[in-house]
Amino acid sequence: MNISPQYLWNQVLERLQIRLTRPAFETWIQDATVQEWKDNCLVIQVANSFILNHLQKTYQPIIAQEVASVVGYPVDIQLTTAEGETMAMTGEAQSYQEKSLTQIAPESPKLNQLNPRYTFSRFVVGPTNRMAHAASLAVAESPGREFNPLFLCGGVGLGKTHLMQAIAHYRLELYPNAKVFYVSTEQFTNDLIAAIRQDSMERFREHYRRADFLLIDDIQFIEGKEYTQEELFHTFNTLHEAGKQVVLASDRAPKRIPTLQDRLISRFSMGLIADIQVPDLETRMAILQKKAQYENMRLPRDVVEYIATNYTSNIRELEGALIRAIAYTSISGLSMTVQNIAPVLNPPVEQVPASPEVILRTVAESLKVSIEDLKGSSRRREISFARQVGMYLMRQHTELSLPRIGEEFGGKDHTTVLYSCDKISKLQQKDWELSQMLSELSDRINMASRTQS
């Protein structure tokens, strides 16, 4: 059959898109490109060795099947990366579905603790969570193989619980009878305490050690719980030796959990530790747009950018701000504009400790006045306003008393400082442009302070 490599690969992609789940296709297959097809060998380039290895281990049969179905005969397939790493796809073209089915036991307890919104399709992937997402999908597809245990690590509200529950949803959608246990550390401990009180430890151990998939959230709360650590150690060993998948989530790496037994640190670190960082601006905007889509809302771009710019610490705060904005505009009947939502949201300003000199210099440069003007007694409107802004920001970013702030501004009285701070605080609740300006000034002060430290 005389067809071009690109046409062949496009046909294969169309077929794979139908056969695979959307998260699986978008994570592993979608960005792969065809490099060459000659001498009955199709060369496919992928982004990195992580994807290359997973395709070889998990998707070799289904890719081989679809390539053969397009050209009409078996074809050798070689995977490569831009760095030159290569791997041949070899082995029997066993059915992808048949291969997975052999790993699952026929019965499973009911699982009623999952949030229906926490699925892979609703998880927004960005540079700061891409590895964690890919690893989570990998263990959901092929448990007990590459990353066991998988340890998700990141701050509060960054998506660890979402990914853990997405793993559980994925397995249960494919295999409703799979024994998938998703619990918090608190629940695991409470179950253990109840078993001790009821003299039913054997039942407790049997329950957790028959899992095909054990996902434990907030594992940092195991700190100081010696007996819980003891039971978890033996449960982990039993499951791991049986090839069952364990997934753990924490706000810190295993070695940073106080009083965690060394043997548990070793076990938790033997698989993959996938870190999740604060999402960047583009990812935060994408999260808001997807959230609005599920709420059947169309958000103006400037509103999305305003919320994403001002809520940077975690996803929960970000989505909470959007919900407040939607609720306010719905109840008030106002249109969704930055001017209308800014006073209601009143976004938090990160306060990095800063020196008075940094604050004075930042305000002077940004508002086009001199430091001498800020410390002087001029009552010109633009200078007086800049001075009030400077006093407000100095109160936000330092621990200085009102009299000390007054001294930094040329010996002003503490009542003048208090008046200025109150005035700016009240104005920003009504004036979205002022609120935005204060946020930008705080960001500049933060950046300058971090550079100095």
Curated annotation (Swiss-Prot):
Positions of the UniProt region annotated as Domain IV, binds dsDNA:
330-453
- CDD domains recorded: AAA, Bac_DnaA_C
Organism placement in taxonomy: Bacteria, Bacillati, Cyanobacteriota, Cyanophyceae, Oscillatoriophycideae
Q: What is one cellular component GO term in this UniProt entry? A: cytoplasm
The record's gene field reads: dnaA
Q: Can you say what this protein is called?
A: Chromosomal replication initiator protein DnaA
Q: InterPro entries, from UniProt?
A: AAA+_ATPase, Chromosome_initiator_DnaA, Chromosome_initiator_DnaA-like, Chromosome_initiator_DnaA_CS, DnaA_C, DnaA_dom, DnaA_N_dom, DnaA_N_sf
Q: Which SUPFAM superfamilies match?
A: P-loop containing nucleoside triphosphate hydrolases, TrpR-like
Domain commentary: Domain I is involved in oligomerization and binding regulators, domain II is flexibile and of varying length in different bacteria, domain III forms the AAA+ region, while domain IV binds dsDNA.
What is this protein's function? Answer: Plays an essential role in the initiation and regulation of chromosomal replication. ATP-DnaA binds to the origin of replication (oriC) to initiate formation of the DNA replication initiation complex once per cell cycle. Binds the DnaA box (a 9 base pair repeat at the origin) and separates the double-stranded (ds)DNA. Forms a right-handed helical filament on oriC DNA; dsDNA binds to the exterior of the filament while single-stranded (ss)DNA is stabiized in the filament's interior.
- Annotated region Domain III, AAA+ region: where? 113-329
Q: What family classification does the UniProt entry report for this protein?
A: Belongs to the DnaA family.
